[in-house]
Amino acid sequence: MKNILVIVDAQNDFIDGALGSEEAKSRIANISNKIKSFTDGVIITTQDTHQENYLETKEGKALPVAHCIQYSQGWGINIEVAASIIAKAATDPSVSYDSVTKPTFGSTELMEKIASYVGDEDFNITFVGFCTDICVVSNALLTKAAFYERANVYVDASCCAGVTPEKHNAALEVMKSCQIIVENE
């Protein structure tokens, strides 16, 4: 069975930048430990990616906080998370790495990458990252819908943070209702 670890939007703007929080900061060590313990599979990072005209977009009008502007400091993957991925890839030949940039919450490109990686096999996929109630839940539900019979979909709650703790918990409940396995609450 194939294994996938998806690190959703572990970007500076969601940790200590424009949309950062203490909860997100406190999850970085957990994410790094999750990377270090991962074996025999692929690690995929997603990056929320917007352009300079973000505030003029539909999302920008609904969430008027410029964030994750492509190539800005806030768009970058957190240095501790990036270092953990690099160290893992350099020392464990059973682990490969891929990435997806995405302009919206859920990523159809991520679904395509998952499909190309797993082929017709059953697989385990674990989601970690930010924000639990926006991009983590969107991608976990897309995966559950796209690969329902073949995927064991997990979310590690100890490696996620939402916009608020209440929204984080609400998203976890929604995912459990949709038969996503939530671990480490």
Task: For each feature predicted by the language model, list its residue ranges.
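Active-site-adjacent betaalpha module
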Residues: 2-4, 30-36, 40-41, 65-185
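Short, hydrophobic/glycine-enriched beta-strand segments
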Residues: 3-10, 14
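Active-site metal-binding loops of divalent metal-dependent hydrolases
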Residues: 10, 48-49, 130, 159
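Active-site loop signature of alpha/beta-hydrolase-fold enzymes
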Residues: 13, 52, 161-162
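Active-site neighborhood of HAD-like aspartate-dependent phosphohydrolases
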Residues: 13-19, 32-33
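Short glycine-enriched, charge-decorated loop/helix-capping segments at active-site entrances
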Residues: 17-25, 62-68
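Von Willebrand factor
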Residues: 35-53
